[in-house]
Design a protein with these regions (language model features):
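Sec-dependent N-terminal signal peptides of Gram-positive bacterial secreted proteins and lipoproteins
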Residues: 5-20
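Right-handed parallel beta-helix/beta-solenoid
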Residues: 23-55, 71, 96-99, 444-451
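Acidic Gly/Asp/Thr-rich repetitive segments characteristic of extracellular carbohydrate-active
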Residues: 37-75, 109, 429, 460-464
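Acidic, glycine- and Ser/Thr-rich low-complexity intrinsically disordered tracts
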Residues: 41, 65, 111, 343, ...
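Extracellular beta-strand-rich solenoid/capping regions of secreted or surface-exposed proteins
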Residues: 55, 59-63, 75-91, 101-128, ...
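Short glycine/acidic-rich loop motifs that flank beta-strands on beta-rich extracellular proteins
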Residues: 74-80, 104-107, 111-116, 136-145, ...
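Right-handed parallel beta-helix
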Residues: 89, 95-99, 123-134, 154-167, ...
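Short, contiguous acidic/charged loop-to-helix segments that flank catalytic cores in large enzymes
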Residues: 303-308, 332-340, 363-369, 389-395
Length: 467
Protein backbone atom coordinates (compact mmCIF):
# COMPACT_ATOMS: atom_id res chain seq x y z
CA UNK A 1 0.00 0.00 0.00
CA UNK A 2 2.84 2.38 0.82
CA UNK A 3 4.42 1.82 -2.61
CA UNK A 4 1.13 2.50 -4.40
CA UNK A 5 0.61 5.63 -2.30
CA UNK A 6 4.04 6.96 -3.23
CA UNK A 7 3.38 6.29 -6.92
CA UNK A 8 0.05 8.11 -6.68
CA UNK A 9 1.64 11.08 -4.94
CA UNK A 10 4.37 11.27 -7.56
CA UNK A 11 1.78 11.20 -10.34
CA UNK A 12 -0.22 13.95 -8.67
CA UNK A 13 2.87 16.12 -8.26
CA UNK A 14 3.75 15.62 -11.91
CA UNK A 15 0.24 16.61 -12.95
CA UNK A 16 0.45 19.79 -10.88
CA UNK A 17 3.80 20.70 -12.44
CA UNK A 18 2.44 20.12 -15.94
CA UNK A 19 -0.57 22.29 -15.09
CA UNK A 20 1.66 25.09 -13.85
CA UNK A 21 3.80 24.94 -16.97
CA UNK A 22 0.72 24.99 -19.20
CA UNK A 23 -0.75 27.92 -17.25
CA UNK A 24 2.53 29.82 -17.56
CA UNK A 25 2.63 29.11 -21.30
CA UNK A 26 -0.92 30.41 -21.71
CA UNK A 27 -0.14 33.50 -19.63
CA UNK A 28 2.87 34.29 -21.79
CA UNK A 29 0.64 34.28 -24.86
CA UNK A 30 -1.44 37.15 -23.46
CA UNK A 31 -0.85 40.06 -25.80
CA UNK A 32 0.04 43.71 -25.29
CA UNK A 33 -0.83 46.33 -27.90
CA UNK A 34 0.42 49.91 -27.79
CA UNK A 35 -1.14 53.05 -29.24
CA UNK A 36 0.46 56.49 -29.53
CA UNK A 37 -0.45 59.76 -31.24
CA UNK A 38 2.80 59.51 -33.22
CA UNK A 39 2.30 55.84 -34.08
CA UNK A 40 1.42 54.17 -37.37
CA UNK A 41 -1.42 51.72 -38.00
CA UNK A 42 0.82 49.91 -40.50
CA UNK A 43 3.29 49.09 -37.73
CA UNK A 44 3.29 46.09 -35.39
CA UNK A 45 1.50 47.76 -32.46
CA UNK A 46 4.39 47.02 -30.13
CA UNK A 47 5.91 49.21 -27.44
CA UNK A 48 8.51 50.57 -29.85
CA UNK A 49 6.26 50.51 -32.93
CA UNK A 50 2.79 51.51 -31.68
CA UNK A 51 -0.41 51.85 -33.65
CA UNK A 52 -1.77 55.33 -34.34
CA UNK A 53 -5.50 54.86 -33.76
CA UNK A 54 -7.78 53.37 -31.16
CA UNK A 55 -9.79 51.89 -34.01
CA UNK A 56 -6.83 49.81 -35.17
CA UNK A 57 -6.05 48.69 -31.64
CA UNK A 58 -9.67 47.67 -31.05
CA UNK A 59 -9.69 45.62 -34.24
CA UNK A 60 -6.58 43.73 -33.12
CA UNK A 61 -7.43 43.41 -29.40
CA UNK A 62 -8.82 39.92 -29.01
CA UNK A 63 -9.19 37.82 -25.86
CA UNK A 64 -6.20 38.14 -23.54
CA UNK A 65 -5.07 41.53 -24.86
CA UNK A 66 -4.17 44.65 -22.91
CA UNK A 67 -4.15 47.82 -24.98
CA UNK A 68 -1.79 50.44 -23.54
CA UNK A 69 -2.62 53.95 -24.72
CA UNK A 70 0.13 56.52 -24.51
CA UNK A 71 -0.20 60.18 -23.56
CA UNK A 72 -2.09 62.46 -25.93
CA UNK A 73 -5.46 63.51 -27.28
CA UNK A 74 -7.29 61.09 -29.56
CA UNK A 75 -9.99 62.71 -31.69
CA UNK A 76 -11.87 59.51 -32.39
CA UNK A 77 -14.30 57.04 -30.91
CA UNK A 78 -13.22 53.83 -29.22
CA UNK A 79 -15.59 51.08 -30.37
CA UNK A 80 -14.75 47.74 -28.78
CA UNK A 81 -14.78 45.00 -31.43
CA UNK A 82 -14.12 41.79 -29.49
CA UNK A 83 -14.99 40.07 -26.21
CA UNK A 84 -12.58 38.70 -23.68
CA UNK A 85 -13.11 35.56 -21.64
CA UNK A 86 -13.03 34.84 -17.91
CA UNK A 87 -9.40 33.71 -18.08
CA UNK A 88 -8.38 36.06 -20.88
CA UNK A 89 -10.14 39.43 -20.48
CA UNK A 90 -9.48 42.48 -22.64
CA UNK A 91 -8.31 45.77 -21.12
CA UNK A 92 -8.01 49.24 -22.63
CA UNK A 93 -6.00 51.47 -20.32
CA UNK A 94 -3.72 54.45 -20.07
CA UNK A 95 -0.05 53.47 -20.24
CA UNK A 96 1.25 53.80 -16.69
CA UNK A 97 -0.20 57.13 -15.48
CA UNK A 98 -0.27 58.84 -18.88
CA UNK A 99 -2.86 61.55 -19.50
CA UNK A 100 -4.96 60.00 -22.24
CA UNK A 101 -7.84 62.07 -23.62
CA UNK A 102 -10.54 60.80 -25.94
CA UNK A 103 -12.11 63.97 -27.28
CA UNK A 104 -15.37 64.54 -29.13
CA UNK A 105 -14.55 68.10 -30.18
CA UNK A 106 -14.22 67.21 -33.85
CA UNK A 107 -17.26 64.94 -34.08
CA UNK A 108 -20.04 65.90 -36.46
CA UNK A 109 -23.36 66.60 -34.72
CA UNK A 110 -25.86 64.08 -36.07
CA UNK A 111 -29.12 62.54 -34.84
CA UNK A 112 -29.16 59.29 -32.87
CA UNK A 113 -26.86 57.90 -30.17
CA UNK A 114 -23.24 59.01 -30.11
CA UNK A 115 -20.60 58.00 -27.59
CA UNK A 116 -16.85 58.30 -27.21
CA UNK A 117 -16.44 54.75 -25.89
CA UNK A 118 -18.91 52.10 -27.06
CA UNK A 119 -19.30 48.51 -25.84
CA UNK A 120 -22.17 46.54 -27.38
CA UNK A 121 -22.77 42.84 -26.72
CA UNK A 122 -19.23 42.32 -25.45
CA UNK A 123 -17.97 40.56 -22.32
CA UNK A 124 -14.99 40.52 -19.95
CA UNK A 125 -13.74 44.02 -20.63
CA UNK A 126 -12.06 46.73 -18.58
CA UNK A 127 -11.72 50.42 -19.46
CA UNK A 128 -9.21 52.04 -17.12
CA UNK A 129 -7.69 55.46 -16.56
CA UNK A 130 -8.98 57.36 -19.61
CA UNK A 131 -10.28 60.93 -19.90
CA UNK A 132 -13.42 61.09 -21.99
CA UNK A 133 -14.60 64.60 -22.77
CA UNK A 134 -16.08 67.35 -24.93
CA UNK A 135 -18.93 65.72 -26.81
CA UNK A 136 -21.78 68.13 -27.52
CA UNK A 137 -25.07 68.15 -29.42
CA UNK A 138 -27.58 70.83 -30.22
CA UNK A 139 -30.12 68.34 -31.57
CA UNK A 140 -33.25 67.17 -29.76
CA UNK A 141 -33.10 63.79 -31.50
CA UNK A 142 -29.53 63.05 -30.44
CA UNK A 143 -28.19 61.47 -27.24
CA UNK A 144 -24.54 62.06 -26.43
CA UNK A 145 -22.64 59.82 -24.00
CA UNK A 146 -19.14 59.56 -22.65
CA UNK A 147 -19.15 55.77 -22.18
CA UNK A 148 -22.00 53.63 -23.51
CA UNK A 149 -22.48 49.93 -22.74
CA UNK A 150 -25.46 48.14 -24.29
CA UNK A 151 -27.01 44.84 -25.34
CA UNK A 152 -26.03 41.77 -23.32
CA UNK A 153 -22.61 43.01 -22.26
CA UNK A 154 -21.42 41.42 -19.00
CA UNK A 155 -18.34 41.28 -16.78
CA UNK A 156 -17.61 44.93 -17.55
CA UNK A 157 -15.38 47.14 -15.39
CA UNK A 158 -15.11 50.90 -15.85
CA UNK A 159 -12.55 52.24 -13.41
CA UNK A 160 -10.45 55.35 -12.75
CA UNK A 161 -11.88 57.14 -15.77
CA UNK A 162 -12.78 60.81 -15.96
CA UNK A 163 -15.82 61.94 -17.92
CA UNK A 164 -16.06 65.69 -18.54
CA UNK A 165 -18.23 68.09 -20.48
CA UNK A 166 -20.69 65.79 -22.20
CA UNK A 167 -23.46 68.22 -23.13
CA UNK A 168 -26.81 68.55 -24.80
CA UNK A 169 -27.66 72.13 -25.65
CA UNK A 170 -31.16 71.28 -26.89
CA UNK A 171 -34.05 72.32 -24.67
CA UNK A 172 -35.44 68.77 -24.71
CA UNK A 173 -32.23 66.88 -25.38
CA UNK A 174 -30.42 63.99 -23.68
CA UNK A 175 -26.90 63.24 -22.53
CA UNK A 176 -25.17 60.78 -20.19
CA UNK A 177 -21.73 60.61 -18.66
CA UNK A 178 -21.72 56.81 -18.28
CA UNK A 179 -24.72 54.82 -19.55
CA UNK A 180 -25.46 51.11 -19.37
CA UNK A 181 -28.60 49.93 -21.16
CA UNK A 182 -29.45 46.28 -20.68
CA UNK A 183 -31.57 45.50 -23.72
CA UNK A 184 -30.41 41.92 -23.20
CA UNK A 185 -29.28 40.52 -19.87
CA UNK A 186 -26.28 42.20 -18.28
CA UNK A 187 -24.48 41.00 -15.16
CA UNK A 188 -21.32 41.72 -13.20
CA UNK A 189 -21.14 45.44 -13.95
CA UNK A 190 -18.52 47.43 -12.02
CA UNK A 191 -18.30 51.23 -12.08
CA UNK A 192 -15.45 52.10 -9.74
CA UNK A 193 -13.40 55.19 -8.84
CA UNK A 194 -14.54 57.32 -11.78
CA UNK A 195 -15.05 61.09 -11.90
CA UNK A 196 -18.13 62.30 -13.79
CA UNK A 197 -18.49 66.07 -13.86
CA UNK A 198 -19.55 69.25 -15.63
CA UNK A 199 -22.30 67.66 -17.70
CA UNK A 200 -25.42 69.13 -19.31
CA UNK A 201 -27.84 66.24 -19.45
CA UNK A 202 -31.30 67.40 -20.49
CA UNK A 203 -33.73 64.68 -19.46
CA UNK A 204 -30.98 62.14 -18.77
CA UNK A 205 -28.51 61.21 -16.02
CA UNK A 206 -24.83 61.40 -15.08
CA UNK A 207 -24.37 57.66 -14.42
CA UNK A 208 -27.28 55.41 -15.37
CA UNK A 209 -27.98 51.68 -15.27
CA UNK A 210 -31.22 50.91 -17.09
CA UNK A 211 -33.08 47.72 -17.99
CA UNK A 212 -32.09 44.09 -17.55
CA UNK A 213 -29.03 44.43 -15.32
CA UNK A 214 -28.58 41.78 -12.63
CA UNK A 215 -25.57 42.31 -10.36
CA UNK A 216 -23.54 45.50 -10.18
CA UNK A 217 -21.30 47.74 -8.10
CA UNK A 218 -21.15 51.53 -8.29
CA UNK A 219 -18.46 52.42 -5.79
CA UNK A 220 -16.05 55.23 -4.88
CA UNK A 221 -17.09 57.52 -7.72
CA UNK A 222 -17.04 61.31 -7.66
CA UNK A 223 -20.11 62.79 -9.36
CA UNK A 224 -20.46 66.57 -9.34
CA UNK A 225 -21.61 69.76 -11.06
CA UNK A 226 -24.19 68.15 -13.32
CA UNK A 227 -27.69 69.42 -14.16
CA UNK A 228 -29.61 66.20 -13.65
CA UNK A 229 -29.53 63.01 -11.58
CA UNK A 230 -26.14 61.82 -10.31
CA UNK A 231 -26.49 58.02 -10.13
CA UNK A 232 -29.69 56.41 -11.46
CA UNK A 233 -30.88 52.79 -11.35
CA UNK A 234 -33.93 52.39 -13.55
CA UNK A 235 -36.70 49.94 -14.29
CA UNK A 236 -39.84 49.71 -16.40
CA UNK A 237 -38.86 52.10 -19.17
CA UNK A 238 -39.16 49.48 -21.92
CA UNK A 239 -35.40 49.11 -22.26
CA UNK A 240 -35.18 45.32 -21.87
CA UNK A 241 -36.32 42.99 -24.63
CA UNK A 242 -37.76 40.83 -21.85
CA UNK A 243 -40.36 42.95 -20.06
CA UNK A 244 -40.45 40.61 -17.06
CA UNK A 245 -36.93 41.64 -16.09
CA UNK A 246 -36.91 45.24 -17.26
CA UNK A 247 -35.34 46.59 -14.07
CA UNK A 248 -31.93 46.98 -12.46
CA UNK A 249 -31.40 44.67 -9.47
CA UNK A 250 -29.03 43.02 -7.02
CA UNK A 251 -26.37 45.66 -6.65
CA UNK A 252 -24.51 48.06 -4.39
CA UNK A 253 -24.05 51.84 -4.55
CA UNK A 254 -21.34 52.54 -2.02
CA UNK A 255 -18.89 55.22 -0.87
CA UNK A 256 -19.66 57.64 -3.68
CA UNK A 257 -19.34 61.39 -3.20
CA UNK A 258 -22.07 63.28 -5.03
CA UNK A 259 -22.61 67.02 -4.95
CA UNK A 260 -23.92 70.01 -6.91
CA UNK A 261 -26.51 67.94 -8.74
CA UNK A 262 -29.46 70.17 -9.64
CA UNK A 263 -32.04 70.39 -12.41
CA UNK A 264 -32.68 74.07 -11.61
CA UNK A 265 -31.86 75.98 -14.80
CA UNK A 266 -31.74 72.84 -16.95
CA UNK A 267 -33.98 73.77 -19.93
CA UNK A 268 -35.77 70.42 -19.65
CA UNK A 269 -36.90 71.24 -16.09
CA UNK A 270 -36.86 75.02 -15.81
CA UNK A 271 -36.91 76.10 -12.18
CA UNK A 272 -37.58 72.68 -10.63
CA UNK A 273 -35.33 71.30 -7.90
CA UNK A 274 -35.99 67.67 -8.82
CA UNK A 275 -32.65 65.92 -9.39
CA UNK A 276 -31.48 63.34 -6.86
CA UNK A 277 -27.85 62.68 -6.12
CA UNK A 278 -28.66 58.95 -6.03
CA UNK A 279 -31.96 57.69 -7.45
CA UNK A 280 -33.58 54.26 -7.60
CA UNK A 281 -36.44 54.43 -10.11
CA UNK A 282 -38.01 50.98 -10.09
CA UNK A 283 -34.89 49.02 -9.13
CA UNK A 284 -34.94 46.08 -6.70
CA UNK A 285 -32.63 44.54 -4.12
CA UNK A 286 -30.19 47.43 -4.03
CA UNK A 287 -27.98 48.58 -1.14
CA UNK A 288 -27.14 52.29 -0.96
CA UNK A 289 -24.56 52.71 1.77
CA UNK A 290 -21.81 54.99 3.05
CA UNK A 291 -22.34 57.65 0.39
CA UNK A 292 -22.03 61.39 0.94
CA UNK A 293 -24.52 63.60 -0.91
CA UNK A 294 -24.75 67.37 -0.51
CA UNK A 295 -25.76 70.58 -2.26
CA UNK A 296 -28.07 68.70 -4.59
CA UNK A 297 -31.83 68.92 -5.06
CA UNK A 298 -32.57 65.61 -3.32
CA UNK A 299 -29.99 63.53 -1.49
CA UNK A 300 -31.23 59.97 -2.09
CA UNK A 301 -34.55 58.95 -3.65
CA UNK A 302 -36.18 55.54 -4.12
CA UNK A 303 -39.51 55.03 -5.90
CA UNK A 304 -40.91 54.20 -9.33
CA UNK A 305 -42.19 56.73 -11.80
CA UNK A 306 -44.51 54.11 -13.31
CA UNK A 307 -47.95 53.41 -11.82
CA UNK A 308 -48.28 50.18 -9.82
CA UNK A 309 -44.52 49.61 -10.04
CA UNK A 310 -42.14 49.84 -7.09
CA UNK A 311 -38.66 50.38 -5.85
CA UNK A 312 -38.46 47.29 -3.66
CA UNK A 313 -36.03 45.90 -1.10
CA UNK A 314 -33.90 49.04 -1.16
CA UNK A 315 -31.51 49.32 1.79
CA UNK A 316 -30.40 52.90 2.48
CA UNK A 317 -27.88 52.86 5.33
CA UNK A 318 -25.03 54.86 6.84
CA UNK A 319 -25.18 57.71 4.35
CA UNK A 320 -24.35 61.34 5.17
CA UNK A 321 -26.82 63.67 3.50
CA UNK A 322 -26.62 67.39 4.15
CA UNK A 323 -27.45 70.84 2.78
CA UNK A 324 -29.58 69.55 -0.10
CA UNK A 325 -32.08 71.96 -1.58
CA UNK A 326 -35.40 70.08 -1.43
CA UNK A 327 -35.00 67.10 0.91
CA UNK A 328 -32.54 64.59 2.31
CA UNK A 329 -34.12 61.19 1.60
CA UNK A 330 -37.32 60.69 -0.38
CA UNK A 331 -39.42 57.58 -0.94
CA UNK A 332 -42.71 57.18 -2.78
CA UNK A 333 -44.16 58.66 -5.96
CA UNK A 334 -44.24 62.43 -6.35
CA UNK A 335 -47.93 62.25 -7.32
CA UNK A 336 -50.73 59.70 -7.36
CA UNK A 337 -50.06 58.77 -10.99
CA UNK A 338 -46.67 57.26 -10.01
CA UNK A 339 -45.66 54.04 -8.34
CA UNK A 340 -44.05 53.82 -4.93
CA UNK A 341 -41.68 52.17 -2.48
CA UNK A 342 -42.13 49.00 -0.45
CA UNK A 343 -40.29 46.49 1.71
CA UNK A 344 -37.34 48.84 2.07
CA UNK A 345 -35.06 49.81 4.94
CA UNK A 346 -33.75 53.28 5.84
CA UNK A 347 -31.33 53.13 8.76
CA UNK A 348 -28.49 54.96 10.49
CA UNK A 349 -28.35 57.84 8.04
CA UNK A 350 -27.40 61.39 8.95
CA UNK A 351 -29.89 63.89 7.45
CA UNK A 352 -28.54 67.31 8.33
CA UNK A 353 -30.11 70.67 7.47
CA UNK A 354 -31.58 69.74 4.11
CA UNK A 355 -34.51 71.66 2.57
CA UNK A 356 -32.26 74.70 2.27
CA UNK A 357 -34.51 76.34 -0.34
CA UNK A 358 -37.54 76.12 1.95
CA UNK A 359 -39.52 73.90 -0.44
CA UNK A 360 -40.91 71.99 2.55
CA UNK A 361 -39.39 68.62 1.74
CA UNK A 362 -37.80 68.47 5.18
CA UNK A 363 -35.18 65.88 6.01
CA UNK A 364 -37.25 62.82 5.12
CA UNK A 365 -39.95 63.06 2.44
CA UNK A 366 -42.58 60.31 2.48
CA UNK A 367 -44.70 60.45 -0.66
CA UNK A 368 -47.35 58.40 -2.51
CA UNK A 369 -47.77 54.63 -2.14
CA UNK A 370 -45.25 53.59 0.49
CA UNK A 371 -45.77 50.37 2.44
CA UNK A 372 -43.96 47.92 4.70
CA UNK A 373 -40.86 50.07 5.00
CA UNK A 374 -38.70 50.30 8.13
CA UNK A 375 -37.21 53.68 9.05
CA UNK A 376 -34.94 53.35 12.06
CA UNK A 377 -31.96 54.77 13.93
CA UNK A 378 -31.61 57.80 11.67
CA UNK A 379 -30.51 61.18 13.03
CA UNK A 380 -32.37 64.16 11.58
CA UNK A 381 -31.43 67.82 12.06
CA UNK A 382 -33.97 70.28 10.65
CA UNK A 383 -33.04 72.95 8.12
CA UNK A 384 -34.52 76.44 7.67
CA UNK A 385 -38.06 75.09 7.18
CA UNK A 386 -37.81 73.28 10.55
CA UNK A 387 -39.52 70.25 8.98
CA UNK A 388 -38.17 66.86 10.02
CA UNK A 389 -40.60 64.53 8.25
CA UNK A 390 -42.84 65.64 5.37
CA UNK A 391 -45.68 63.23 4.54
CA UNK A 392 -48.29 64.98 2.41
CA UNK A 393 -50.03 61.79 1.24
CA UNK A 394 -52.39 59.44 3.06
CA UNK A 395 -51.26 56.42 0.99
CA UNK A 396 -48.83 55.46 3.73
CA UNK A 397 -49.42 52.07 5.34
CA UNK A 398 -47.66 49.49 7.48
CA UNK A 399 -44.48 51.55 7.77
CA UNK A 400 -42.44 51.40 10.98
CA UNK A 401 -40.55 54.28 12.58
CA UNK A 402 -38.15 52.98 15.21
CA UNK A 403 -35.46 54.58 17.38
CA UNK A 404 -35.09 57.67 15.18
CA UNK A 405 -33.42 60.73 16.69
CA UNK A 406 -34.80 64.20 15.98
CA UNK A 407 -32.34 66.95 16.85
CA UNK A 408 -33.78 69.25 19.52
CA UNK A 409 -32.31 72.76 19.35
CA UNK A 410 -32.83 75.42 21.98
CA UNK A 411 -35.19 78.16 20.85
CA UNK A 412 -36.16 76.37 17.62
CA UNK A 413 -39.36 74.49 16.97
CA UNK A 414 -39.72 71.19 15.18
CA UNK A 415 -42.34 70.34 12.57
CA UNK A 416 -43.52 66.89 11.55
CA UNK A 417 -46.11 66.31 8.81
CA UNK A 418 -47.85 62.93 8.95
CA UNK A 419 -50.63 61.95 6.52
CA UNK A 420 -51.21 65.59 5.63
CA UNK A 421 -51.49 66.75 9.25
CA UNK A 422 -48.86 69.04 10.76
CA UNK A 423 -47.53 68.53 14.29
CA UNK A 424 -45.30 70.79 16.35
CA UNK A 425 -45.50 68.49 19.36
CA UNK A 426 -43.10 65.56 19.20
CA UNK A 427 -45.26 63.47 21.52
CA UNK A 428 -48.32 63.99 19.32
CA UNK A 429 -46.38 63.14 16.17
CA UNK A 430 -44.96 60.09 17.87
CA UNK A 431 -48.45 58.88 18.70
CA UNK A 432 -49.86 59.64 15.24
CA UNK A 433 -47.01 57.88 13.43
CA UNK A 434 -46.88 55.02 15.93
CA UNK A 435 -43.18 55.62 16.45
CA UNK A 436 -41.69 53.39 19.12
CA UNK A 437 -40.88 54.55 22.66
CA UNK A 438 -37.16 54.77 21.92
CA UNK A 439 -37.65 57.42 19.25
CA UNK A 440 -36.29 60.62 20.77
CA UNK A 441 -36.23 64.39 20.49
CA UNK A 442 -32.83 65.35 21.86
CA UNK A 443 -29.50 66.92 20.91
CA UNK A 444 -27.41 64.04 19.44
CA UNK A 445 -24.18 65.97 20.13
CA UNK A 446 -22.20 65.78 16.90
CA UNK A 447 -18.46 66.31 17.25
CA UNK A 448 -18.21 69.23 14.82
CA UNK A 449 -21.10 69.58 12.36
CA UNK A 450 -19.83 72.94 11.09
CA UNK A 451 -16.88 71.03 9.66
CA UNK A 452 -19.12 68.16 8.53
CA UNK A 453 -17.86 65.88 11.27
CA UNK A 454 -21.05 64.05 12.16
CA UNK A 455 -19.48 61.56 14.50
CA UNK A 456 -21.09 61.57 17.93
CA UNK A 457 -19.32 62.74 21.06
CA UNK A 458 -18.32 60.08 23.54
CA UNK A 459 -21.10 61.02 25.95
CA UNK A 460 -23.81 61.51 23.30
CA UNK A 461 -27.21 60.48 24.69
CA UNK A 462 -28.02 58.59 21.48
CA UNK A 463 -24.72 56.87 20.81
CA UNK A 464 -26.03 53.41 21.64
CA UNK A 465 -29.08 53.94 19.44
CA UNK A 466 -27.10 55.28 16.49
CA UNK A 467 -24.68 52.39 16.64
Amino acid sequence: MKKMTLIALAAAAAAIMIGLVLHDTVAKKDKAIYVAVNGDDRSAGTKTKPFRTLNKAAAEAKAGTTVYIRKGTYHEQLVVKHSGTKLKPITFRAYKKAKVIISGKNQKDVEGDRSLITINNKNYLTIRGLKVQDLTTGLSDATVMGIYVSGSSSHITLEYNQVHRIKTLADDGNGHGIALYGTGKMKDINILNNTVEDLKLGYSESIVLNGNIDGFKVENNLVRRNDNIGIDLIGYEGTSNDKKVDFVRNGVVKKNRVYEISSFGNPAYGEEYSAAGIYVDGGKNIAIEKNTVYQSDIGIEATSEHPEKYAENIIITNNIIYHNFFTGISIGGYDEKRGGTKNSFISQNIMYRNDTKGIEGGQLLLQHDISNNVIEKNILTAGPSRIFIANYFTTNKENKLLKNVFHEEKGKKGIWVWKEKEYTSFSKFKKASKSDEKSSYVDPEYKNPNKKDFRLKRDSPVKTIAN
